[in-house]
């Protein structure tokens, strides 16, 4: 019964919107920030998203990725709507969840080890604690 309660609590936390965030760019700025991402790293694809949530994962620590030397921060993006994915992994209208943040640029470019997520419009930000994250993995 305890496991069901933990899952229910996790689902409640995941469904809550979180606090308003002023990150994100305007629709008419998308091309400007795609170009900015390409200046940072020409080999990474851009995934343009809206209706997004920034999740701060309250975990003890994420280590540097020893293979790439990248620092990872305990944050991910979950978006309910993909506008465009330059890599062709997702269709317009799909939802997506990123891997962990490696860098955040210009208030709207969420960089992971292999992708730039361009946050369009306003979104929300919330925290999930380590115990709830572990419960999700069960």
Kindly give the residue locations of the regions a language model identified.
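N-terminal non-globular leader segments, chiefly Sec-dependent signal peptides
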Residues: 1-104, 122-138
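Amphipathic alpha-helical packing elements
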Residues: 107-121
């Amino acid at each position: 019964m305890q496991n069901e309660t933990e899952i229910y609590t996790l689902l409640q936390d995941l469904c809550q919107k979180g606090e308003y965030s002023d990150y994100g760019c305007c629709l008419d700025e998308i091309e400007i920030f795609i170009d900015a991402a390409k200046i940072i790293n020409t080999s990474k694809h851009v995934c343009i998203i809206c209706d997004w949530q920034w999740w701060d994962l309250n975990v003890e620590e994420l280590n540097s990725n020893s293979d790439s030397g990248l620092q990872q921060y305990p944050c991910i993006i979950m978006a309910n709507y993909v506008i465009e994915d330059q890599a062709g992994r997702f269709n317009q209208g799909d939802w997506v969840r990123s891997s962990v943040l490696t860098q955040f640029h210009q208030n709207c470019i969420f960089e992971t080890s292999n992708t730039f997520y361009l946050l369009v419009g306003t979104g929300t930000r919330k925290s999930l604690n380590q115990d709830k994250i572990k419960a999700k993995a069960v």
